[in-house]
Amino acid sequence: MVEMTRLDIAQGDFWLCLEQRLAWEGVADETVVATVREILKAIRCRGDEALLEYTQRFDGLEIARAPELEIPTSRLQAALTAISREQREALQVAAERITTYHRHQKQESWSYTEPDGTLLGQQVRPLDRVGLYVPGGKAAYPSSVLMNALPAKVAGVSELIMVVPTPKGEMNDLVLGAAAIAGVDRVFTVGGAQAVAALAFGTESVPRVDKIVGPGNMYVATAKSMVFGQVGIDMIAGPSEILVLCDGKTDPEWIAMDLFSQAEHDEAAQAILLSPDGVFLDKVTEAMARLLPTLERQEVIANSLRSRGTLIKVENLDQALEVINFIAPEHLELSVEDPQALASRVRHAGAIFMGRYTAEAIGDYCAGSNHVLPTSRTARFSSPLGVYDFQKRSSLIQCSPQGSQTLGRVASVLARGEGLTAHARSAEYRLKG
């Protein structure tokens, strides 16, 4: 038996009920905040000494000297050799596709020259150094390494520093192998808020970075939010989400498994199915009941579906689009006859998976698009991680002698209107006559 809340857009309190289902408290509790604040202060003040202490305390890693925290590149290559041929080839295929996709995103510098010779433009440059946080231990997320590292490499980032916790020295060869394929420059066996602090402030051994990307637990997310402003960050991600719109003509078992694919992340993950066909909603529910016992993470999935999973009945696809754009889902599947036409009407979604044969899991691993996506309705104003996140822009302005006369007079008038005399005179000193 699968328990999921069922809503109908025709019910009077539909939008209120939907908002309640979407609500998620993403703020860390006071204990977490206090702990993270203490860790950040210690790393900032005592550097490697504090980093070693926290690594020994939280990861049980007995290392006497901080330089031993760095994993040599030879170990990354050894990990790549140690994994199975099938895994190695899968990582390489995924890496090639991710690189190809992200090359299309790369922004270039541009400029134009006005008739009087004044030049205006924009110079695009990569960040110097980026830090990548990767969960470690028994969890293996090589896909996160590829998705975060490869766009940075395409952007031209000079140095990519990866941090990954290795509890009791346990290293994951898939993760290290992915780092080798992605061209990560340096890897350190540190994790948690202390790793974020080391990247943000720098220590004697860990270099300070310009931006920190990558997923992590509540302590990592809280640390990232606290150091933001001193360094850039990608985003503070919430639980994983999927919204599937189906017209009722796709195999119910396919849809059931698509919903499971996100619900298995954790109990806070959210899976929503939207359909104008009420009978189809019943069929998917029946399929989930059959398939759930076959899955290793069935308890996590069941809890996720019970707490946040939702089945929504709409009258037509126009109503479905209204709901989709309200939810602004992280992952959106359009399992309908003409998905491209429908996709053009979607205003808010992290990634749109079009057609009956496009499982969301393909995007998680190897389609080529990035799986780091805005969650918790932030797709209303945010975008997937991309090359542009690892580039920055500088404005270019060069006035010709003639241009300085025309623009100088305009600047003078506006500056004096604001009461900024030095601004005005700076422009006026270049005026002739």
UniProtKB/Swiss-Prot annotation:
It comes from the Bacteria. NAD(+) binds at residues 133, 194, 217. It catalyses: L-histidinol + 2 NAD(+) + H2O = L-histidine + 2 NADH + 3 H(+). InterPro entries: Ald_DH/histidinol_DH, Histidinol_DH_CS, Histidinol_DH_monofunct, Hstdl_DH. The active site is at residues 330-331. It is an enzyme of class 1 (oxidoreductase). This is Histidinol dehydrogenase. It comes from Nitrosococcus oceani (strain ATCC 19707 / BCRC 17464 / JCM 30415 / NCIMB 11848 / C-107).
